[in-house]
């Protein structure tokens, strides 16, 4: 079974061979019935998230947060990875500082429960 490449001169023949003269006698809902009957009505009964009020988490976002998201979105992959590395290093350093302070508190006996 050999395949023949179409040459530029027989492009009209190729185009003609792709035409379909099939008549669609029904409306599209009849052609493509719902997979689960009633789902479309159920989904339509809820308000669109676009028209309803913003979610609670969105209402709590401040202008600085939006600016930070825009800044992060504009970073290249390499710059974003560098930013993530910096945050990981900062988190590690904070963990070390917390550990030092907890050890210090233990030695100073400020973390013991008061005796009754």
From Swiss-Prot:
PANTHER family: LIN52 FAMILY MEMBER, PROTEIN LIN-52 HOMOLOG
Identification of the protein by name: Protein lin-52 homolog
Upper classification of the organism: Eukaryota, Metazoa, Chordata, Craniata, Vertebrata
Pfam families tied to this protein: LIN52
One example of a Gene Ontology biological process annotation: regulation of DNA-templated transcription
Keywords: Phosphoprotein
Entry similarity comment: Belongs to the lin-52 family.
Assembly and oligomerization: Component of the DREAM complex (also named LINC complex) at least composed of E2F4, E2F5, LIN9, LIN37, LIN52, LIN54, MYBL1, MYBL2, RBL1, RBL2, RBBP4, TFDP1 and TFDP2. The complex exists in quiescent cells where it represses cell cycle-dependent genes. It dissociates in S phase when LIN9, LIN37, LIN52 and LIN54 form a subcomplex that binds to MYBL2.
Gene Ontology CC, one term: nucleoplasm
Positions where Phosphoserine occurs in the chain: 28, 53
Origin species: Homo sapiens
Keyword field contains Phosphoprotein: yes
